[in-house]
Regions:
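Flexible loop linkers connecting adjacent transmembrane helices
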Residues: 42-70, 94, 100-103, 116-152, ...
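Helix-loop-helix module between adjacent transmembrane segments
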Residues: 32-37, 110-135, 142, 146-179, ...
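N-terminal alpha-helical transmembrane segments of multi-pass membrane transport
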Residues: 1-86, 96-103, 114, 421, ...
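Transmembrane helix-loop junctions in multi-pass membrane proteins
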Residues: 6-8, 39-44, 88-92, 101, ...
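Membrane-interface loop-to-helix entry segments
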Residues: 28-35, 39-52, 161, 178-185, ...
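Extracellular/periplasmic helix-exit of transmembrane alpha-helices
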Residues: 119-129, 133, 235-251, 259-266, ...
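Selective recognition of specific alpha-helical transmembrane segments in multi-pass small-molecule
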Residues: 113-121, 198-212, 223-243, 281, ...
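Alpha-helical membrane segments and immediately flanking helix-loop junctions
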Residues: 61-97, 124-127, 133-142, 146-148, ...
């Protein structure tokens, strides 16, 4: 039973979150994405092939991993692990359920501009990182924030960001992810959540205590595996429902601009709903501009910042245009198109018996059977949430050390493991809302620094060859 304190605080935090997500963040992050798309002359298109070759062409796949760094591929895998969390299934389902199939179109639009933003984050993280004498690499938004703003103001912004991300991702964020793991494992397989919690913290402790190198070694294996499993299952569904694929794409584009007025408020409200849901999910799923993934990209051992910037672009592409899109196509082709139970629901289906937690299960269940579909989604959610915990823990640790020094690392790890276990055994809506609020607040100093350092990013995007003298590691 919620205490009076929780009852009082919950609506306040919820109101702040709604204001931030509906107004401040959409405008700020979309604005930064459009700004960098223009200033870099559409770097996400110009340099897409270059980034693709770096990731899949064996150029940096087996790159140097000396000191405290990673290969470029490991850094990308760690970044994708953070991006592809439970939101890639539950969040997308919620956006479609609320905003209709048209929300997917706006996810694509936002993600296109987000690719330019994440290029800026990765290049700045590389440019401002610090390599210590023992090979340890320190990098992330706190370092380019203090580069953008000198003196007390810069330290304040960096400190604000560090506190927000440590709490939002390192503690409460990991708690939210472990909660999803515990709930899905108990529902799908009947495993008690406390057992899941114990197993989870044992595995996490082994990886955390192994440092950056062990984490990188795990993510470079887990991320391709989890993506392959989800893509394989999704493709099976799409093959079975192949005759509805043209209708699915038609619904995405048609309802992005002409949604049916299913929800109260009429035509205009339905369009705003599709745009807002698609925009928010697009922003929060790819994490471009939020300041999380630059921590991973800063650790990559590459010749120049531009290289890792192009690799970061591919991360958003894989997250949004491959995994997220596949999930959206599965949901729409099975539930909205043809003879689906939500057929004709162009805007939203809030009055139905579906919710964001069971929509994906029902979608996969139409082909696999509900029980098998639930188990498949549960397995995928486990991998997605587990990989996110690993990356978010690293990002939080980097900022904890920035705030309190190296001696705080072990204390942080112990606290993180406690929060991970608690997350599997309890559900607290206030924790979810506080995590979302801090997650959104950390965007503000990061976005301000990104705009202030535009000239640095433009320099790298236009003249990478002349800036390739730095060798890391």
């Amino acid at each position: 039973m919620a205490s009076s304190f929780e009852t009082t605080l919950f609506p306040i935090v919820q109101t702040i979150n709604e204001y931030l997500s509906n107004y401040v963040l959409v405008i700020l992050l979309l604005g930064v994405g459009i700004w960098y798309t223009i200033k870099t002359r559409c770097v996400q298109v110009r340099c897409f092939k270059e980034g693709w070759n770096r990731v899949f062409g064996n150029i940096t796949l087996n790159g140097k991993k000396s000191g405290g760094g990673m290969s470029s591929f490991q850094a990308l895998a760690t970044a994708i692990a953070a991006q592809v969390g439970t939101g890639i299934i539950v969040g997308v389902a919620g956006a479609i359920l609320t905003g209709g199939p048209g929300a997917v179109f706006w996810m694509w639009v936002i993600s296109f501009f987000g690719m330019a933003t994440i290029y800026a984050e990765a290049t700045l993280a590389q440019e401002t990182r610090i390599v210590e004498l023992d090979g340890t690499i320190k990098g992330g938004p706190v370092y380019y924030i203090t580069t953008a703003f000198q003196g007390k103001f810069g330290k304040f912004l960096a400190g604000f960001f560090a506190v927000a991300i440590t709490l939002a991702l390192g503690f409460m964020g990991c708690m939210v992810q472990s909660n999803s793991i515990g709930a899905t494992m108990e529902t799908a397989f009947g495993i008690p959540s406390w057992v899941v919690g114990i197993v989870l913290i044992v595995i996490c402790a082994f990886i955390f205590l192994g440092g950056v190198q062990r984490l990188a070694s795990v993510t470079e294996k887990v991320v391709p595996l989890m993506a392959a499993v989800f893509l394989f299952g999704g493709l099976i569904v799409l093959v079975v429902r192949i005759k509805y694929i043209p209708e699915t794409f038609a619904m995405i584009f048609r309802y992005a601009f002409e949604p049916q007025a299913i929800v109260g408020g009429g035509f205009g409200y339905a369009i705003r709903l599709a745009i807002s849901q698609g925009a928010k999910r697009g922003l929060f799923s790819n994490e471009a501009g939020m300041g999380s993934t630059p921590h991973a990209h800063a650790l990559a051992n590459v010749k120049n910042p531009h290289e890792q910037g192009t690799v970061a672009i591919i991360g958003v592409f894989i997250d949004m245009f491959v995994i997220l899109t596949l999930n959206a196509l599965v949901i729409i082709s099975t539930l909205y198109a043809g003879d689906g139970p939500l057929a004709g629901c162009g805007a939203a289906a809030l009055s139905s018996t579906f919710n964001k937690t069971n929509l994906a299960q029902c979608a996969f269940g139409t082909v696999f059977g509900y029980k098998a579909g639930s188990m498949f989604v549960a397995i995928c959610l486990f991998f997605f949430a587990f990989s996110t915990i690993l990356s978010w823990n690293l990002f939080g640790k980097i900022n904890m050390v920035y705030l309190f020094g190296k001696k705080s690392a072990n204390v942080y790890t112990l606290l993180a493991l406690i929060f991970i276990f608690l997350g599997t055994t309890m559900s607290n809506d206030l924790v979810w809302e506080l995590s979302d609020m801090l997650n959104q607040l950390m965007v503000i100093p990061n976005a301000i620094a990104l705009l202030a350092l535009t000239s640095h990013v433009v320099k790298h995007s236009h003249t990478p060859d002349r800036l390739s003298g730095r060798e890391n590691g």
